[in-house]
Amino acid sequence: NKKNFTTTMKTKLLPLMLLAGIALSGCGTADTAADSFVRVENGQFLLNDKPYYFIGTNFWYGPILGSQGPDGDRGRLARELDALRDRGVTNLRVLVGADGEEGVPCKIEPILQTAPGEYDDALLDGLDYFMREAARRDMKVVLYLTNSWEWSGGYSQYLMWAGEEKAPIPGIDGWNPFREYVAGFIPNERAREMFADHVRFIVGRTNRYTNRKYSEDPAIFSWQICNEPRAFSDENKEEFARWIGSTARLIRSLDPNHMISTGSEGLFGCEVDTLLTERIHAFPEISYVNLHIWPYNWQWATAGHLDEEFDNARQLTREYLECHLDIAERLNKPVVVEEFGFPRDSVRFDRGTPTRLRDAYYTDLLDRVIGSKAEGGLLAGCNFWGWAGEARPAHHNWQRGDDFCCDPAHEPQGFYCVYDDDTTAELIRDANRRLEATPLPGEATKAQ
């Protein structure tokens, strides 16, 4: 039962997570009428007054491609957006930008916020350009504003800016020292206020290509507080919840139009505390329930045993999802599985490696979204991790100048990403066709 499942998470999987330091590892827009913004009504997303269900992707590096700096590639950006749209993918989860210094191992570059309140204008330009190009293709974009993990700065960078000692690097110094360090973000008022200033700057921005305020841009699906926000200790849980609530209220004070989301992994992002998971999603400013699912990272399936443990991974995935659907039902809010992934066969990274188990795992989740649409259910969408498209990474360990492929700099390139010639890419195309053809309750069956 679900109570026993939560107990299992606490007693068995959380210690593994603490030891391993698991992380991850969110045309037609001229009309500014309220209906062109996605909103929530009675537990459903509505777009143009119709229920909105989607199968989307993570594409955190899109704004970097949009820049005119040395790391940008507007030609590739256009091709990737077109390739995604061709596969029915029109919901993108994107990082606003990285924080801090360059030259840090396991961290992405280039850097948007180079010092508190100081920004690389080429990357702001790239963000504006990316948003315009997404809007031209009728895409919706989740913009997450910071990160609890080291790969883009986030918590640890704000702590250093607030005067704390140099942050440990998980891949070098170990995950436990990093976890202990970033647990200092939630109680650090100075670090939190610098982040709040960043929120004010980005949410208050006007796009230089469209001359439209971000707060008035229907292409934004939701503002997201953080990628995988965590308290990082039981002692921080109360203050963590208050921080989520206060940040959501800040965003709402700046933008009355868009949805707001947490970016949470769900239970595993809340110290395996069901009440905390529900509490951070219960704030009236928070529009929907987030969760992330990482069966390999969470050791539901392990290297050398992927085949034997695959059914276990699928079953635990279903149970984890059901726990969050229960929360959503109590809150009467939709659910988005905004990150999920599975390794290539034999946990290899090379392009061309078969994805037999990944495809089977994806099919389970994609079918759940399609089935939910048929029932008018609370599971409204998912974003797979992540789109690599035409990328050809030159190294397993990312180096600046290598193609971005959605696997962040702290992970092997090719680990979870989906290339345009993977069988997974066609699976996604087929799933979106089936989703589009699936009638809502009370509708006649759509033409296939």
Name each model-derived stretch.
Residues L13-I22:
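Sec-dependent N-terminal signal peptides
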Residues T11-L13, V94:
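Hydrophobic alpha-helical segments, especially transmembrane helices
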